[in-house]
Amino acid sequence: HIKGKYLKSLASGDKLGAFSLSEPQSGSDASNMQTTAQKKGDHYLISGIKNWVTNGINSDYVILFAVTEKGVGHKGISCFIVEKGWDGFEMGKPENKLGIRASDTCELYFDTVKVPDENLIGKEGEGFKIALETLNGGRIGIAAQALGIAQASLNASVSYSKERIQFGKPISTYQATQFKIADIAMEI
């Protein structure tokens, strides 16, 4: 059901998704997660706050992690799809980030949001495993972003050193500047 309802529109680019694991009090430490999903008949009632959610404002759907069973640590975490616009689901203002500004990042607020059973991804208690599998796949992309940012910084440093004139010459001609740029290049 979930694949048919959500994946096709995400894969085609018609819809945008977000991943919400981190929380204000615990960061990405899932064992201290405060967001809860309480089973009530054919749905769950989800309450809590998520932060640092990339695409949180512009997303149509959010993958949400919440505690369905307290006292068992990460084994009590489950994963859900929550749709934008459902009662009790609010987006915070965008964070003013220093980088990766092509996507928004914000807090998300869930105040007794009614989520149907069929929006549970996997089974109850499998959320932590799903989160780790997703994060592992994303680490390559994050590393590529970091490498790209570092390379762009090196390129900007070289460019600036050729343009900046000090004592009648570009600072790129001074050995101290060359050493600093070489150090940056070696770190990359």
Regions found by a protein language model. Name each.
Residues 43, 47-91:
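A short core secondary-structure module
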Residues 89-188:
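Glycine-rich beta->alpha junctions and the first turn(s) of the following alpha-helix
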